[in-house]
Amino acid sequence: MIRINNTWIKIALLNFLIVATLGTFLRFAFIKELTWMDYLHFQTAHWHLAVFGWIYQAMYVFIIGAFLTPEQQAQKKYHTLFWLNQTLIIIVFLTLITKGYSFFSVDEDICFVVLIGGFVFSILKDLKISSGSNRLISNEFLKIAFFFLLLSFLGIISIIPIELLFSAKRSIFYYLSSQFFLHFQYNGWFIFGILSLFFKMIENYGIKINTDKFRQFKRLLLAAALITYFLNIYWGYPGHLVFLWIASLGGGMIQITALFIVRKDISMIFGELKPHLNSVTAVLMKFAYISFCIKLILQVVIAYPDLASVALTIRNYTIAYFHLVFLCIASVFLFAWNVQFNKLKLIQKNSNTGIYVFSFSILSVELLLFLQGTLLWIGVGFMTFYYELIFLLTLGIPISIVLIIFQNIKHSNFGDINK
């Protein structure tokens, strides 16, 4: 049975609320100068908290609740790891807000490796005990998610020697190391972590799947996640088209092929899941799935060099892509999981108002970012009141999270486990 620790998920949602609030301030800074705010420091704190405070903490809660037995979930080590990680998140956040990214904050990031390594080791050890020799497809995806989670930290660990050797914080090697971390977080840990939870849901409801097909799907996605990193190398060395073609035509087409192989199976799975799902959960999961398909298409489209250059130089497109993965895929799926298994069902007509506001806000922001990026691309320039409009739409995200947290508190008697 899948369970959720209400206290932990509320902490993760509070982290997400701070992330969204910071993002709103960053938008407002383009309308009115905020003399008290160091933009770069806030921006760095924003993405750090998004990755470690929201996605990682929420995944931590959901993975433990989905993959471990109640007895394993109650072990002291998981409670200790959660609160140590949350304490470190607060320390890193305050460091970044006040001092920005430095050797000290890199050291703090390395501390995450220790805590995350402890979590991964503990989960894998307990999974071996609870699952025995039973090869579950969800476990296989989870192991790959953990592989990418740990692999991504090579990007952070390498920053210190790069700065010492090259004495240039913004050197090409610094760029490649930071992108290494982000790439394997967004395209590895996020995606495979979500898929592991999705397949665990399928197993939980006793739905049979073609495991051979989905193992082929898994291998192709794994190869594509590794190959698509070459796009970052191309952006670092734009004269070398071979890197672009490897990433976009190779990695992109592999992902499209992977999705094509299981497209009918996914349709069948959604059909069999429908009777089990909250109506809001079903909509959110389809939203995340469509966003995932759009992500794959975009990775193929930028195989054309001019489009790849546009994607890099027009900041609106870059932000829209990161938001597509972080908000439209990862966050939407995590909300869907919370609605489904934290029992936030439509007890009242307005129970999921926060979910609706969140979905509308992120979709509107994505469309506006892509529209403004296209206007810049064709030489039209900025639309009238663009910054005011995107600020107002972004404001809906923290408001929606407040509503979601309120619902978690209001129905805290559901889905609770040992605190």
What kind of region is each of these model predictions?
Residues 1-419:
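Hydrophobic alpha-helical transmembrane segments of multi-pass integral membrane proteins
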